[in-house]
Amino acid sequence: CHKCPLGKTRTNLVFGVGDPMAKLMFVGEAPGRDEDIQGEPFVGRAGQLLTKIIEAIGWKRSDVYIANVLKCRPPENRNPLPEEIVLCMPYLIKQIEIIQPKVLCALGTFAAQTLLNTKAPVGTLRGKFHEYKGIPMMVTYHPAYLLRNPNDKAKVWDDMKKVRDFLNELPGKDSKI
């Protein structure tokens, strides 16, 4: 993709990874350095923490789908620019349409604000289900934030238990997400 300048500065396009039939889809902000090198979302320290979070609620990383709002790394890991989000959003929308998750989980400010079209801070959005185009969506803190603010891990644990419980109550659920 060369719709914005990020296509010229990236090493790899970081589209998404996981089960294309996943009932749970995580959406983050943008690839970081490790993700840009490996071409897969959430493989650095934040990704390792996300994997631990997924495993803590009894699932495997391979059972979920993981994507980002942006598919290319912003230079120096700066925040995504509004025009980059606008240009990249159709790809995320298509991913969500293809995966058809039963629950979305927005990780952090940019994912939450983009999907909910709001300026509200994550602290006020997290902990309860919202809706994105009819899909229940939980907002929680980004794993990178948790690496800097480990005292908020309990809040994310509470959010993820709500997601787990919601999925476990779905009719026709099986042992796999």
Language-model regions, residue ranges each:
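A polyanion-binding, active-site-adjacent surface
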Residues: 1-177
